[in-house]
């Protein structure tokens, strides 16, 4: 309450988050700002992210929607796509796939969020079995961020799903030239080629590290690739 402006309340909250302060809670500062200006975009977005990290996705969604309501009062396509992107994730984590899809598309209007948004769009299209659309979307993501390694894995998966195994192997090889530790692409190369040497190389590099396997498994799950 001693801080005079909403701007400084927001910046103080950001500072506390960045430096992981042991005794001060950034949420207190965002809440104070919102008690003065309930529609503040940045503080609502920040609050939503904090609730997301706690797994409180419905609470997060409410804050993102409030931020978007303010952002779109005069302009249906806001200058900042982050609240829409975060809304997409909060909806996705609640199983609201269609709402998530729409939110990610709105976020993609903003250039800064195109690679991340089109990647999430491609994941949802893959879940729906819309592989051609998903391939178009993942290409848009890679156009904005050529070294998006998760997008590269997804493209390999889609090419293989569409029976373009040779193209999948070639793209996996190109991706491994960029990052030889892209285990998603390495695994996709094995699935597309059927060569056991690819699988053995992956196992060698993974060093039986269970957490690594879990992380890469989650990447496949996020695109509905449970079988893989």
Regions found by a protein language model. Name each.
Residues 14-15, 49, 89, 123, ...:
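Residue-level recognition of tetratricopeptide repeat
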Residues 22-23, 57, 97, 131, ...:
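TPR-repeat structural position
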Residues 43, 76-78, 83, 117, ...:
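TPR alpha-solenoid repeat register
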Residues 19-20, 54, 94, 128, ...:
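Structural motif corresponding to the intra-repeat A-B loop/turn of tetratricopeptide repeats
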